[in-house]
Amino acid sequence: ISSRRGFQATDLALVAVFAALIAVLAVIPPIFMVGAVPFALQMIAVMLTPMVLGSVRGGCAIGLYILVGVLGLPVFSGGASGVGVLVGPTGGFLWGWLLGAFVAGAVATVVLRRRPRKSMLPVWLFLVALVDLVCVYLGGILGLMAFAKLSLNAALAANIAFVGLDLVKGILACLIATAVLTAFPRLMP
């Protein structure tokens, strides 16, 4: 992002492409199950977005995805749409995605501006994924408590089964981000 002129055409295109990637992966059914936990691809894109785009562009991409869903396009999980999703049982996760994009994107920007050794880049990006996951789970747990009226213990229990797979998705997002940022270093936030 140019500090003098705001968003450039490239920034807008990247925001739109990453919002579209998240939307497309939302409607693809889980590719397999691990016990009762589905392995859906959408969370990989959610974690990849701030790693590659940074805080502002990453937050805008997640925000655009949410806006498109709120305005009625069926881009939320299971083909859902509308403002009701934001205040439904899983709405907190969407809020967590937005928070995570800004916070993890800021961490990614700091990490990438320090120009870590290529061999260490995936490790640093995994740290970014962990920051993102903390924000997502924080939003999701608070959303379950507020919108589904679950207790803290019940909300934590509802999420525990997903943590392992989300860590695997974080590793995949790190590997993809490393490849993208190595091939296109000018994308770095």
Regions found by a protein language model. Name each.
Residues 12-17, 32-48, 59-64, 67-75, 102-122, ...:
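Hydrophobic alpha-helical transmembrane segments
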Residues 1-2, 17, 24, 83-136:
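Short helix-perturbing small/polar motifs within transmembrane alpha-helices
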